[in-house]
Amino acid sequence: MIPKVKKKVTHRRDNNKIYGRKQGDYDFLKNWAIIRKWAIITYGLKSTADLEILMFLYSEKLFTRTQFAEHSNFLSWDKDRFNRLLREDWIYIWRHRNHQETHLYEVSYKGKKMINSIYKKLLGLEPIPESVRRNKIFLKTAPFSHKTLAIAIKNHNKELKERKLRPSPGLQ
């Protein structure tokens, strides 16, 4: 037989609530949307999926077309993505195929430079350029979406500058 257990009744006191909150250790993805859009516009990529696949392949070092296709399965569908990235020099053939081995590909120097630049901006090591010469988002003839992105970039750079002036106590 199962013994009966009395439930302990607790009353809530609204005036004595204790709130606990943990501050996250990392916040470098906070501005990912701004940096992602900046990279797509600046480097002339067709979509976010192109950027995502290049970032995946960058960490893979050498890859085959099969590996590219496997990772492309859960991205937006684009039949010509591989050939377009190859044609636009984002990836290149590292080893040509022979009778026993398939082609091996690698992200090109152009792609590696872009991804390194994105990582530096995410980590706060360098700001996003605000000059018209280095960033076509700041052109006077830019569309409205570019102008709203320009405002977000200015705010991001301002926040980055303030963070460098007052480093966080956890990093000392």
What is each residue range found by the language model?
Residues 86-99:
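A short, conserved structural fragment
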Residues 42-47, 96-120:
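Short, cationic-aromatic polyanion-contact patches
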Residues 109-144:
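Short, amphipathic alpha-helical interaction segments positioned at domain boundaries
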Residues 59-72:
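Short acidic, hydrophobic short linear motifs in intrinsically disordered regions
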